Amino acid sequence: LYRFHQWWYAERDHDHNGICEYGSTDGTLIAAAWESGMDNGVRFDDTRMLKNEMEKAWSMDQENICLNSFLYVDKLTLSEMASILGKQELSEQLAKEAEVIKLYVQTKMYDSESGFFYDIRLNDRTPVKVMGAEGWLPLWAGIATPEQAESVKNIMMDEKHFNSYLPLGTLDVSHPALRPTFGYWRGPVWFNQVYFGITGLKRYGYVEEADLLTRKFMAHAQGLMTDGPIHENYNPLTGEVLNAPNFGWSSALILRLLLDQ
């Protein structure tokens, strides 16, 4: 597990600053976007690829807020595992590295003007100002300061941004690139991002808001309150089912949402 974790820093940290980027082995942007899991996300529309030092290693030219939130949690988890195994030096090293990510995200990847977290460009550290579901990952991870979490919460609860008919879509519903029907990661609602968002709100004490969004999601996603199949994603404006039925992580995460109530 530790070797896999370290792979990111060997293959996907273009400037060796301890903050990673999604990338690919063949230098193509589409493969790098696939690596993110958010295949056609709007934040990647103007992204370019950079060759890294390792053979067959390329990075996007932007540091990714979701990836580094995941890596922060990885470091804390691995630190705890190392401590249990008696590897105290490694445990302390990982904990220190996690703090580096936390401070960087708080100070570099949060935009105080808009009150949201974003990917940032490598060349000038400016934010890629596309409000997407990745922006609440620092709440799920426990990285955000209380003030930052409150600002992100306000945006999540705003009907002009993410509190749409079916809430917590993958793109701000006021964004001109929104494609609510068959847009895949350009607006539709995915269960995993809903789960991250609701869990993040609860982590910072916004239980009432989290419960409101959970109830709204369950009531408005087509078929969830009947015997309809659970789908891959949903239209944020209508709740209409989209793409593959009987989708695995969607089904699993409904249970998590309900059990966490």
Regions inferred by a protein language model and the residue ranges of each:
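Extended, well-ordered alpha-helical scaffold segments
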Residues: 1-8, 74, 78, 85-105, ...
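Well-ordered alpha-helical scaffold segments within catalytic/enzyme domains
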Residues: 7, 69-88, 137-148, 195-207, ...
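Extended glycan-interaction surfaces of carbohydrate-active proteins
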Residues: 14-63, 100-189, 222-261
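Amphipathic alpha-helical coiled-coil segments and their boundaries
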Residues: 60, 64-67, 87
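Peripheral, non-catalytic segments that deliver or gate enzyme domains
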Residues: 64, 182-206
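Amphipathic alpha-helix face/heptad-repeat signature
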Residues: 67-70, 94
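A generic structural signal for well-ordered alpha-helical surface patches
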Residues: 195, 199, 211, 215-219, ...
